[in-house]
Amino acid sequence: MIIRFLALLFSAVVLVSLGHAQEKTHESSNWGKYFSDFNAKGTIVVVDERTNGNSTSVYNESRAQQRYSPASTFKIPHTLFALDAGAVRDEFHVFRWDGAKRSFAGHNQDQNLRSAMRNSTVWVYQLFAKEIGENKARSYLEKLNYGNADPSTKSGDYWIDGNLAISANEQISILKKLYRNELPFRVEHQRLVKDLMIVEAKRDWILRAKTGWDGQMGWWVGWVEWPTGPVFFALNIDTPNRMEDLHKREAIARAILQSVNALPPN
């Protein structure tokens, strides 16, 4: 009995050790040069599943654990909320423009899910938030284990100006589940959201991603699909120069993804 107990205990220790070994994160300090090239401060997490064992690399690991407003990256789960709640039927559902002139030209027209995702059309998602309500939004967020799961706000949109916050590491967790259709929503809705996220596609790979910006900090999150597996990424940077800094999000992330052959060179 004692021998059996010790054998079981040893097996448990080995399994735990292996689990920790698989979860080990590599600090890629050399990626700092890509941030320096653009005079930017931020973090990026890259999870490469093209090999037998997952490879997780991060630049600025402490920041990767810090939570920030998700801004428009929240359109990824928010679209799932809206589909589940019946606030939108499908990608062909048209939302009529109210005629109010907004700062982004792409917002000043009728929208559907595809254009709203592509143009980051805030007013469409404001309609969703109003119909879903705070209590149901909180329930969805808790079910997803999304960041701090707090949709409260004193003013403005809770995913931009409110209390909702998520880290780069947590963004990766959500993206990985979405890739595998493992989020607690209908599979067909998850597949639709992934289709809406397509930014670029070639014969061998597909880039699915979403930007975000709250005025002070910018995101670019998503993944690149290869025949051998996906490469997930989540980047955020400070944007002290506001809109002048926005191009840096994709530029830095693309350079890093190219450095690990997750995207082809320009």
Swiss-Prot record:
Q: Which residues form the signal peptide?
A: 1-21
Q: Which SUPFAM superfamilies match?
A: beta-lactamase/transpeptidase-like
Keyword Nucleotide-binding present in the record's keywords: the answer is no
Database matches in PROSITE patterns: BETA_LACTAMASE_D (PS00337)
> GO biological process: what's one of them?
antibiotic catabolic process
Residue numbers bearing the N6-carboxylysine modification: 75
Enzyme Commission identifier(s): 3.5.2.6
Signal among keywords: yes
The similarity annotation says: Belongs to the class-D beta-lactamase family.
Please describe what this protein does: This is an oxacillin-hydrolyzing beta-lactamase.
In Swiss-Prot or TrEMBL terms, this protein is called: Beta-lactamase OXA-20
What species was this sequence derived from?
A: Pseudomonas aeruginosa
Classification lineage: Bacteria, Pseudomonadati, Pseudomonadota, Gammaproteobacteria, Pseudomonadales
